[in-house]
Amino acid sequence: MEYRVERDTMGEVKVPADRYWGAQTQRSLEHFRIGAWRFRMPLEIIRAYGMLKKAAARANLELGELPEEIARAIIQAAEEVIAGKLDDHFPLVVFQTGSGTQTNMNVNEVIANRASEILGKPLGSKYVHPNDHVNRGQSSNDTFPTAMYVATVLALHQHLYPAVEGLIATFEEKARAFDGIVKVGRTHLMDAVPITLGQEVGSWAAQLRNTLAMVKEAEKGLYNLAIGGTAVGTGLNAHPRFGELVARYLAEETGLPFRVAENRFAALAAHDELVHVMGALRTLAGALMKIGNDIRWLASGPYGGIGEIFIPANEPGSSIMPGKVNPTQVEALPWVVVRVFGNDQAVAFAGSQGNFQLNVYKPVMVDAALESIKLLGDAVASFDQHLAQGIEPNLERIEEHLNKNPMLATALNKAIGYDKAAEIVKKAIKEKKSLKQAALELGYLTEEEFDRIVVPMRLAKPHENA
């Protein structure tokens, strides 16, 4: 392998000749191989950094802080970072300095060398300097949290929201299709008064819509960026208008309302906005766990379970039991939820660990958040495509359970009173008789009265046509 010599304030470092990174990235590679098999800095952060460095170069050009030739080359190189053309030049891991300095310098060095190359200068020449030019008016302490928030917002919009909204649409369509199917309601895992299958599925759509709205509301906090705060929040070495311009250019680049944080001291020292978003993601994940468990129970069987719905049989379920089919999508989804719950705890703890002017748990916080967003998006899309869209009612089983449901006696409360209705239920259960038969034998109602009062659809929709 051929090498070139790069230099930083600590001396000379050998860097692979075909890599755009420089001395500080190489030092990090040598000192931090922690979790390299898996925990590479997320490319979402790199893309966000590309947007940030492009916006910074535009701002510095407008403010007269950079020569036009240098600024234009930085912008072109940053656009290549955004497009993913330079992904192989970002090898660092999540487990590094807590401010993300090494990743910031990785981006600075790659853009500086690529910009120098664009201008016809050799790699390592520092014709475009990683600190003086690419990082002008910036610190890792304000750029990394800015990239964190931009990356997280973009991940929500690109990975999570479309998947969840697709599942909501599927459930709403199923709810309309199943609205005329009356079934047993269940509370405490016990039989309760009837509902329609459409009402049950519709409740899943509503729960997801509510929890997704919580995530979207929490997301608004991430629009407040630390950029312009530099090292401790004072804005030292940055033009007074720099942060405002960068935020404006980021908003233009993304189409999202990014702005400078009202208090940049707090924006460096704490990341409560990200903690809030993770809490909302945990709530959404909890809703998915509940819905998944409902579906797993309702589809259980084929003979020993509830079996009121059919779900797609996607693959054989057992290596020893022929013909067995398992609800695999409903099992994979809760595992993702468990992962998100764990990540929420990691982000919550890391968010509490700011000291004075800086929180130094930034990389692990954003890695956990991005993993959660992407896992949830993937799991929900898979669940929708391979399970939810294929849910169908088992009408025979639904009717069987409904006809045996003793809680239909609730309809008799107004006619004969709670105590007599309870007596009918006890007799029906004890003697394994239908509710109607027990009522007639006790003499509390005639057959005509029973049939007029106990109408399952009216119990499921008591206020329609009232």
From Swiss-Prot:
Active site, renumbered: 188, 318
UniProt-annotated location(s): Cytoplasm
Annotated InterPro entries: Fum_hydII, Fumarase/histidase_N, Fumarase_C_C, Fumarate_lyase_CS, Fumarate_lyase_fam, Fumarate_lyase_N, L-Aspartase-like
GO molecular function list: fumarate hydratase activity
EC number in record: 4.2.1.2
The reaction(s) this protein catalyses: (S)-malate = fumarate + H2O
UniProt keyword list: Cytoplasm, Lyase, Tricarboxylic acid cycle
Site feature Important for catalytic activity, where: 331
SUPFAM superfamilies recorded: L-aspartase-like
TM annotation in the entry: none
Binding residue positions for substrate: 99-101, 129-132, 139-141, 187, 319, 324-326
Entry GO terms, CC: cytoplasm
Functional pathway: Carbohydrate metabolism; tricarboxylic acid cycle; (S)-malate from fumarate: step 1/1
A biological process from GO: malate metabolic process
NCBIfam families, alphabetized: fumC_II, PRK12273.1
Assembly notes: Homotetramer.
Family: Belongs to the class-II fumarase/aspartase family. Fumarase subfamily.
Described function: Involved in the TCA cycle. Catalyzes the stereospecific interconversion of fumarate to L-malate.
More about this protein: There are 2 substrate-binding sites: the catalytic A site, and the non-catalytic B site that may play a role in the transfer of substrate or product between the active site and the solvent. Alternatively, the B site may bind allosteric effectors.
PANTHER family linked: ASPARTATEAMMONIA/ARGININOSUCCINATE/ADENYLOSUCCINATE LYASE, FUMARATE HYDRATASE, MITOCHONDRIAL
Name this protein carries in UniProt: Fumarate hydratase class II
Organism: Thermus aquaticus
